[in-house]
Amino acid sequence: MSMANERPRVLSGIQPTSGSFHLGNYLGAVRQWVDMQDTHDAFYMVVDLHAITVPQDPKELRENTRVAAAQLLAAGLDPDRCTLFVQSHVPEHAQLGWLMNCITGFGEASRMTQFKDKSAKQGNDRTTVGLFTYPMLMVADILLYQADQVPVGEDQRQHLELTRDLADRFNQTYGDAFTVPTAYILKETAKIYDLQDPTAKMSKSAATPKGLINLLDEPKATAKKVKSAVTDTDTVVRFDRETKPGVSNLLTIYSTLTGAEIAELERKYEGKGYGALKTDLADVVVEFVTPFRERTRQYLDDPETLDAILAKGAEKARSVAAETLARAYDEVGFLPAKH
């Protein structure tokens, strides 16, 4: 097990494909990554190798990678308290990914639900082998850093089980090369729903962007989205996920951003109707996104500093990854290169 100051090591990553983070993925993951810097030896990466399992425009991918890194820093990741890097800057990911491919059964890989879901939507001709082997690269991402813990939500549990299975399989077949990680269950965060369809999770794949609170949008546009959020024909501000999903979603967002209890908010808006709630919430959201947007812009306007942070992170990541890969190569029986 690898430790820094006796802290468990944790690894997580985020896709660079979305441009702006939205409020749902910020609250669901990124905010907790920021907190984990104080309790863990934390490694965080922008997973551009994973991004190309589906078609990407090269210029957009490059830009989105920078924007994702800038937003992580704007959210509070501190390069002195965590290791932040871009996945493709550490070639050991792809190298260990190949070893993981070679110890994974075809049937085992076929059962991964994410592949089944995406390939069903795209059809066989448009589904890449990269998408099929995506989970094995994810396993390599984790094992390279001898991560003790992996932050997981419900949709990632299957990938963590595969990671544990492959780590055990490799260790038993060849020799102990990998830490077998455990799940770090992310705190039960309030689920944030689409403003236009409050029965669906806030997501980039939504039918319309009107329901998304993008953190890099113009604050005025964000305020307008909040004020236009779908509610119901009633006027009572009350939390009830079943019968009042729209209002409940607005109360959840308000509570999550301010720390106010939902019951307290219900009392505050008793007899005031939805208009007052939406107006105040629009102000709360704008107050949150405006400084976030400004901090992100500062990093993007100073590419030298951003590049230096990512280079430092990649150097630290490679120092750990290279050691793990060398050990795995030795256990497999590869002839060592003599320099």
From Swiss-Prot:
GO MF term (any one): ATP binding
Function: Catalyzes the attachment of tryptophan to tRNA(Trp).
HAMAP family reported for this sequence: Trp_tRNA_synth_B
Keyword annotations from UniProtKB, A to Z: Aminoacyl-tRNA synthetase, ATP-binding, Cytoplasm, Ligase, Nucleotide-binding, Protein biosynthesis
Binding of ATP, residues: Q15, P16, T17, G24, N25, G153, E154, D155, I192, K201, M202, S203, K204, S205
SUPFAM superfamilies xref list: Nucleotidylyl transferase
UniProt catalytic activity: tRNA(Trp) + L-tryptophan + ATP = L-tryptophyl-tRNA(Trp) + AMP + diphosphate + H(+)
Chief localisation class: cytoplasm
GO biological process terms held by the UniProt record: tryptophanyl-tRNA aminoacylation
Subcellular location: Cytoplasm
The organism of origin for this protein: Streptomyces coelicolor (strain ATCC BAA-471 / A3(2) / M145)
UniProt-listed Enzyme Commission number(s): 6.1.1.2
NCBIfam families: trpS (TIGR00233)
Residues that, per the record, bind L-tryptophan: D141
Family matches, as CDD domains: TrpRS_core (cd00806)
Sequence motif: 'HIGH' region, positions: 16-25
The keyword Transferase is annotated on this UniProt entry: no
Broad class of enzyme this protein falls into: ligase
Protein's name in the database: Tryptophan--tRNA ligase 2
Assigned protein family: Belongs to the class-I aminoacyl-tRNA synthetase family.
Gene encoding the protein: trpS2
Segments carrying motif 'KMSKS' region: 201-205
Assembly, per entry: Homodimer.
Entry GO CC: cytosol
